[in-house]
């Protein structure tokens, strides 16, 4: 049987560019090469699609954070939308076009805006090209934490208390210092309890997230809102929840099938090298191996673990999920579960929760990739 030709995409214009590269490298190494022929396609930070660039198989977190560059020998990728699955070409130096051949599916291992937000999913929908992952609606809604909460709340799924701010009306020149009292008034009116977490609505990997600990400190709050605004003008201010953060991997390779949920896992934060405890920020996730470790299943009663699994599946269905997602939840001391956010293209690095959770549930990394791809093949 002929191998299926799969375009694996990585990089992109988002802040998560390098993590996407590492995720794709891990996925490519795990790909069943007896079944699939992979064509790696990178997207540079300025949005250029290239093929035959640097080989991503050599990338790992141990070597730092890679970026997609147009190296000598790399070719621009050109799409002919009307040709659908036969519409992928590499532009040669003399301007001629070399076809990829029939592309059976695309695996967009892209995180953040322009990759995980419904835009590229819409492109492949227009081309009629099968792709791994959530569709346009779920991708767009889950990229925006505000609208994720709107959908979940409408489905009766508990979410953290919070408010949403529009930073476009704030004074950027003063770094929002002149808006500090007005921002504080909105938080006070909502009755939010400290600590607060201020985060961009449409960013991932903890970019722009700040913990605000001092109640009544308008300057600290305004500074946190300004930091978040560097990534997005829509900003969430959420009440900190006295709970454990438990993550659950959801898998639904074929449209219309019931989603499956892994054993829930927990990122256990360890002391940082400098001796400080802190929340799970970008450095804790990717740059400091001593900052945390993963436990799957999480050390919780089985009844609570099953409640997390059921909540994750309900959340996945509520946003019209497809393919895969990682549902992040809060579990309180009395066993209540609320959803924090949904990642429609979770990390696939060697330390990422999604593949680790499925491995602990009995699905090997290679089999996981195979299930995801075969689920969308025609």
UniProtKB/Swiss-Prot annotation:
Q: Has UniProt tagged this entry with the keyword Transcription regulation?
A: no
Cofactor dependency: Mg(2+); Mn(2+)
InterPro entries named in the record: ATP-grasp (IPR011761), ATP_grasp_subdomain_1 (IPR013815), D-Ala_lig_Van_CS (IPR000291), D_ala_D_ala (IPR005905), Dala_Dala_lig_C (IPR011095), Dala_Dala_lig_N (IPR011127), PreATP-grasp_dom_sf (IPR016185)
Q: Which GO terms describe its biological process?
A: cell wall organization; peptidoglycan biosynthetic process; regulation of cell shape
Give the co-factor note.
Answer: Binds 2 magnesium or manganese ions per subunit.
Q: Care to name a GO molecular-function term for this sequence?
A: metal ion binding
Look at the named UniProt entry and state the broad enzyme category this protein falls under: ligase
- Write out the residues that bind ATP: 189-247
What does the entry list as the binding residues for Mg(2+) 2? Answer: 341, 343
Kindly state which keywords UniProt assigns to this record, in alphabetical order.
ATP-binding, Cell shape, Cell wall biogenesis/degradation, Cytoplasm, Ligase, Magnesium, Manganese, Metal-binding, Nucleotide-binding, Peptidoglycan synthesis
* Chain sites annotated for binding Mg(2+) 1: 328, 341
ATP-grasp domain span: 149-374
Q: What is its EC number?
A: 6.3.2.4
| Pathway info | Cell wall biogenesis; peptidoglycan biosynthesis
Q: Which GO terms describe its cellular component?
A: cytosol
* Reaction(s) catalysed (UniProt annotation): 2 D-alanine + ATP = D-alanyl-D-alanine + ADP + phosphate + H(+)
Q: Where in the cell is it found?
A: Cytoplasm
Q: By its UniProt entry, which PROSITE patterns does this protein fall under?
A: ATP_GRASP, DALA_DALA_LIGASE_1, DALA_DALA_LIGASE_2
Q: Does the keyword rRNA-binding apply?
A: no
According to its UniProt record, which protein family does this protein belong to? Belongs to the D-alanine--D-alanine ligase family.
Q: What does this protein do?
A: Cell wall formation.
> HAMAP family, alphabetically?
Dala_Dala_lig (MF_00047)
This protein is called what?
D-alanine--D-alanine ligase
